[in-house]
Swiss-Prot record:
<dbReference type="GO" id="GO:0005886">
    <property type="term" value="C:plasma membrane"/>
</dbReference>
<feature type="transmembrane region" description="Helical">
    <location>
        <begin position="214"/>
        <end position="234"/>
    </location>
</feature>
<keyword id="KW-0472">Membrane</keyword>
<protein>
    <recommendedName>
        <fullName>MFS-type transporeter aprT</fullName>
    </recommendedName>
</protein>
<comment type="function">
    <text>MFS-rype transporer; part of the gene cluster that mediates the biosynthesis of the asperipin-2a, a bicyclic peptide that possesses two macrocyclic ether rings consisting of 14- and 17-membered paracyclophans. AprT is likely to be involved in the cellular export of asperipin-2a.</text>
</comment>
<feature type="transmembrane region" description="Helical">
    <location>
        <begin position="114"/>
        <end position="136"/>
    </location>
</feature>
<feature type="transmembrane region" description="Helical">
    <location>
        <begin position="239"/>
        <end position="259"/>
    </location>
</feature>
<feature type="transmembrane region" description="Helical">
    <location>
        <begin position="380"/>
        <end position="400"/>
    </location>
</feature>
<dbReference type="GO" id="GO:0022857">
    <property type="term" value="F:transmembrane transporter activity"/>
</dbReference>
<feature type="transmembrane region" description="Helical">
    <location>
        <begin position="302"/>
        <end position="322"/>
    </location>
</feature>
<feature type="glycosylation site" description="N-linked (GlcNAc...) asparagine">
    <location>
        <position position="495"/>
    </location>
</feature>
<keyword id="KW-0813">Transport</keyword>
<comment type="similarity">
    <text>Belongs to the major facilitator superfamily.</text>
</comment>
<keyword id="KW-0812">Transmembrane</keyword>
<feature type="transmembrane region" description="Helical">
    <location>
        <begin position="336"/>
        <end position="356"/>
    </location>
</feature>
<feature type="region of interest" description="Disordered">
    <location>
        <begin position="1"/>
        <end position="38"/>
    </location>
</feature>
<feature type="transmembrane region" description="Helical">
    <location>
        <begin position="150"/>
        <end position="170"/>
    </location>
</feature>
Length: 502
């Protein structure tokens, strides 16, 4: 993806605005560096492979945890409900059947527990990403990754204690697991670091391909994780839960082996930084960091595309969709997980075959950025139509086509990321990716509260009201499609992109 210099934005590295939240290799001027490593002109395939392994492990581990966790929480909440209201309905010490758990009283408790757990996780990881990003800026990325890894351990222990010891810890105490993100900043910082490293290690001419491959790897891993989880859950929900945790920690282990990519500054700069430890200097450093993001205000296309990363998060993750399918269509969580896995399966040819072929043909006639913009318009429309169908579906026969339609727009976030990267300058990439991750995290915070409360409201009324959360998001995505439809790229961006394409 080309990185044109926009006529409306000028940056002088000497005025301090180039100080990034999470700097890339190219984020600092050559004069301030004391390193014999040249600027990235060719892709660093060794680093890309390591990052690919990390994404594969995390991409399998995360989805593999979600459905078993929901089922275990549902089982415990269901047993607690019947113990309080009619103990004679309980089957004994063995696992309670899912059919007894689909009543609104139990599902509202499950939605509350899972939803607020997502809220606290997203809120704290978003809050602490900034200070730990400053730490990564000054002391390096390896230290930030190690602290985040310790935070993951604390999060896992505190989150899963109520599952393993339900007679000691109430289910809602799993919300305290979010405290683990106070140490290390959590997923927001990690993914900001990873995407920044990908940008550092990838040449401009290969960035689109690399981003697409990472997206394919994540979706493929999610599909395999959901299929495996759905099958194993029929026997024991705890097995895929622990397997997913193992994969997550394996990914973190590889992340701790990544090389340091923060460039060393000159001795004069280092001494100056070490002696500036007063509160006043810290305040101005934070102010300078925040001020460095003002390039968004001068880049109109970037400013109008950025909210799309927020809106796409409002649909919630697979955990909410699995629970919705299970409740609405009276399916087990394992069966609902399999339906979501089929949706993921369809996204693989969309990302791997359909989008690249369409993109290649389009670029024979229009520039790279124009092609990305057109594909983004089509993809977000498919997302909106798919969610509209999911929210209105009254049977599996109408749900499945809606899931496939939604899967057809699965490339939107990746396309939008590539588009917005091409509209920004090279030295703005690290800050832009951090801003994208923060925007998505804010979307996750909002989504967890929004879906939890709107789904509980819909459960109390039943019928089509249960699908209300997805209907509202489909309307917001339609607005994004309208904004992208009237968006026009700066002429200079189009020329720069066209020149780098051929």
């Amino acid at each position: 993806m080309a990185s044109p210099e926009l006529a409306s934005h000028h940056s002088d590295p000497s005025d301090g605005e180039g100080a990034p939240f999470l700097p890339g290799v190219d984020d600092e001027s050559p004069e301030s560096l004391n390193s014999d490593i040249p600027f990235q002109k060719h892709s660093n395939h060794g680093l890309i492979i390591k990052l690919f392994v990390i994404y594969l492990a995390i991409g399998m581990g995360g989805p593999m945890i979600q459905s078993p966790l929901t089922r275990i929480v549902e089982s415990i909440a269901c047993r607690n409900y019947w113990n309080a209201h009619d103990p004679s309905q309980l089957p004994g010490p063995e696992q309670i059947s899912e059919g007894m758990c689909k009543i609104p009283e139990v599902q509202r408790e499950v939605t509350t527990i899972i939803g607020y757990r997502e809220f606290f996780n997203a809120f704290l990881t978003s809050t602490f990403a900034l200070p730990y990003g400053l730490l990564a800026d000054r002391y390096g990325r390896k230290l930030a990754i190690r602290l985040a890894s310790v935070g993951f351990v604390f999060n896992s222990v505190l989150s899963f204690a109520p599952i393993w010891l339900p007679n000691i810890f109430p289910l809602r105490t799993m919300w305290f697991g979010a405290v683990g993100w106070v140490l290390g900043g959590g997923p927001v910082l990690l993914f900001a670091l990873f995407w920044s490293m990908i940008a550092d290690a990838t040449a401009d001419s290969e960035r689109d391909t690399v981003i697409l491959r990472f997206g394919i790897a994540t979706v493929s891993a999610g599909f395999l994780a959901n299929v495996t989880s759905s099958f194993v859950m029929k026997f024991d929900s705890r097995v895929p839960l622990m397997t997913g945790c193992g994969l997550l920690f394996a990914g973190l282990l590889v992340a701790n082996l990544l090389p340091e990519t923060l460039r060393k500054k000159s001795p004069e700069t280092t001494i100056s930084a070490d002696t500036s430890v007063s509160l006043t200097s810290l305040f101005f450093r934070i102010k300078k960091t925040i001020w460095s993001y003002r390039f968004i205000c001068y880049n109109y296309p970037v400013a109008v595309i950025l909210p799309a990363f927020f809106v796409t998060q409002l649909a919630g993750g697979s955990a909410f969709l699995v629970q919705y399918i299970s409740i609405r269509f009276h399916r087990t969580i394992a069966d609902a997980t399999l339906l979501v896995a089929l949706q993921h399966a369809f996204t693989i040819p969309v990302l791997f075959f359909i989008l690249p072929q369409i993109s290649e043909r389009l670029r024979a006639y229009i520039s790279r950025l124009q092609s990305d913009l057109l594909l983004a318009r089509i993809s977000v429309m498919l997302l909106a139509l798919g969610l509209f169908g999911i929210g209105l579906s009254s049977s599996i026969n109408t749900l499945i086509p809606s899931l496939l339609l939604h899967a057809g727009g699965a490339g939107f976030v990746l396309i939008a990321r590539g588009l917005i990267t091409g509209l920004a300058r090279r030295e703005e990439t690290a800050r832009l990716y951090t801003l994208i991750e923060a925007t998505q995290s804010i979307g996750e915070v909002t989504a967890s509260l929004y879906i939890t409360n709107s789904l509980n409201w819909g459960l109390g009324r039943g019928g089509l009201w249960i699908g209300l959360p997805w209907l509202i998001v489909s309307f917001l995505l339609a607005l994004i499609a309208l904004v992208l439809g009237i968006l026009r790229l700066p002429p200079r961006s189009e020329n720069a992109s066209s020149g780098s394409t051929h």
